[in-house]
Curated annotation (Swiss-Prot):
It is a multi-pass membrane protein. This is Dolichol phosphate-mannose biosynthesis regulatory protein. Component of the dolichol-phosphate mannose (DPM) synthase complex composed of DPM1, DPM2 and DPM3; in the complex interacts directly with DPM3. Component of the glycosylphosphatidylinositol-N-acetylglucosaminyltransferase (GPI-GnT) complex composed at least by PIGA, PIGC, PIGH, PIGP, PIGQ, PIGY and DPM2. Interacts with PIGA, PIGC and PIGQ. The chain crosses the membrane at residues 11-31, 49-69. It is found in: Endoplasmic reticulum membrane. The gene is DPM2. One of its GO terms (biological process) is protein glycosylation. One of its GO terms (cellular component) is glycosylphosphatidylinositol-N-acetylglucosaminyltransferase (GPI-GnT) complex. Regulates the biosynthesis of dolichol phosphate-mannose. Regulatory subunit of the dolichol-phosphate mannose (DPM) synthase complex; essential for the ER localization and stable expression of DPM1. Part of the glycosylphosphatidylinositol-N-acetylglucosaminyltransferase (GPI-GnT) complex that catalyzes the transfer of N-acetylglucosamine from UDP-N-acetylglucosamine to phosphatidylinositol and participates in the first step of GPI biosynthesis. May act by regulating the GPI-GNT complex.
Length: 84
């Protein structure tokens, strides 16, 4: 069973994910249909970032996954050399 702290952290992460999803959905799907002079446009970044930010996040994710896999493989290789 999860502790109270775990539940609060989990709820916070879910809430943050929902906020980001709602913001990104409004930014990418709804904003192009709203007049460019409308006041709501000042709350969103330029549209070029709608592609650049997820692309950069994807690259960073792949980089960290690759580094982690490399680290684990090298560590396991060193452990097997020590036991032999």
């Amino acid at each position: 069973m999860a502790t109270g702290t775990d539940q609060v952290v989990g709820l916070g992460l879910v809430a943050l994910s929902l906020i980001i999803f709602t913001y990104y959905t409004a930014w990418v799907i709804l904003l192009p249909f709203i007049d460019s002079q409308h006041v709501i446009h000042k709350y969103f970044l330029p549209r070029a970032y709608a592609i650049a930010i997820p692309l950069a996040a994807g690259h960073l994710l792949l980089l960290f996954v690759g580094i982690f896999i490399t680290y684990v493989m090298l560590k396991n290789q060193n452990d097997t050399k020590k036991t032999q």
